Amino acid sequence: MTNIRKSHPLTKIINSSFIDLPTPSSISSWWNFGSLLGICLAVQILTGLFLAMHYTADTATAFNSVTHICRDVNYGWILRYMHANGASMFFICLYLHVGRGLYYGSYTYTETWNVGIMLLFAVMATAFMGYVLPWGQMSFWGATVITNLLSAIPYIGTNLVEWIWGGFSVDKATLTRFFAFHFILPFIISAMVMVHLLFLHETGSNNPTGIPSNMDMIPFHPYHTIKDILGLLLMLTALLVLVMFSPDLLGDPDNYIPANPLNTPPHIKPEWYFLFAYAILRSIPNKLGGVLALVLSILILAIIPLLHTSKQRSMMFRPISQCLFWLLVADMLTLTWIGGQPVEHPYIIIGQLASILYFSIILIFMPLASLTENHLLKW
């Protein structure tokens, strides 16, 4: 008799995706982040669901409802801080996951890669709207500044912004719709994750060498499940340490001041995971140019498969490309730091140089380095 795991219509889908899935034996811990992102999404949906039971999306009561969750709801404080810091963990895993894809050439699976880029945009949109919900000073002014960027679009910009606001400023209508979208998007993201996995399982996983590993596969369970559980324990430990010991470490103190349209905070800045893009936006003096640079800083990932000029897929055996990759990482960290600094000398020029370097590495230096390495192979 065939094992029910392999014959039942429902369990055989799970079996072929998570149990008997043939997986390269050589994949390292850099391949853990996909499963960690899945766990992050589940944690965010669950904590978010319970928070939504007590939250009110109204300008008069939103701030107080969050305070009520933290003070009066049983374990409300842990729900709130797990959700807020879970978002930070989500983005750490996301950036490491994308970085892994860049380093090991996973972007040559173009369908999986493109769905991944759409997922990145969806998660960023969700996180932005979630940051608006507590209705503190940074929530209100962050929403005002970021939505206002759309007014840079020629001709329709102003109408578009007022349409998104639901009025002539960020107000009750804006908060209500942001809550609605913040609630629905994670479920859309879950569906997109299924598509992401569907495309991945069409081709199978890449591996550190970038060489096809069809002749050296092992079942996903128990080998990689055990490995993923180790990553999960490490991530949950980090998250719980953050939540229990310094829950406000990554937040902004200004968000503990209720939103006041008459009082602008001295430094408006988004959450830390958007600072690199915010620094690129600020480094261009022109509004439309800044908005385009902001969008392109993420959208540039879509053309990376076209810029792949190397004869090898992975960077494992390409030292020049490796140096450029780590330079790009250092550059992104520099941009993240600059994004949190005031707009004054020397931060302005550092931000501009880091922004130029960011695009130059991806568009010019990396393809050239790959061509150089191709020539070196002939020696």
Curated annotation (Swiss-Prot):
It is a multi-pass membrane protein. Heme b b562 binds at H83, H182. Keywords: Electron transport, Heme, Iron, Membrane, Metal-binding, Mitochondrion, Mitochondrion inner membrane, Respiratory chain, Transmembrane, Transmembrane helix, Transport, Ubiquinone. Its main location: mitochondrion. One of its GO terms (cellular component) is mitochondrial inner membrane. GO terms for molecular function: metal ion binding; ubiquinol-cytochrome-c reductase activity. One of its GO terms (biological process) is mitochondrial electron transport, ubiquinol to cytochrome c. Its cofactor is heme b. Pfam families: Cytochrom_B_C, Cytochrome_B. Binds 2 heme b groups non-covalently. CDD domains: cytochrome_b_C, Cytochrome_b_N. It is found in: Mitochondrion inner membrane. A ubiquinone binds at H201. The cytochrome bc1 complex contains 11 subunits: 3 respiratory subunits (MT-CYB, CYC1 and UQCRFS1), 2 core proteins (UQCRC1 and UQCRC2) and 6 low-molecular weight proteins (UQCRH/QCR6, UQCRB/QCR7, UQCRQ/QCR8, UQCR10/QCR9, UQCR11/QCR10 and a cleavage product of UQCRFS1). This cytochrome bc1 complex then forms a dimer. Component of the ubiquinol-cytochrome c reductase complex (complex III or cytochrome b-c1 complex) that is part of the mitochondrial respiratory chain. The b-c1 complex mediates electron transfer from ubiquinol to cytochrome c. Contributes to the generation of a proton gradient across the mitochondrial membrane that is then used for ATP synthesis. Heme 1 (or BL or b562) is low-potential and absorbs at about 562 nm, and heme 2 (or BH or b566) is high-potential and absorbs at about 566 nm. This is Cytochrome b. It comes from Natalus stramineus (Mexican funnel-eared bat).
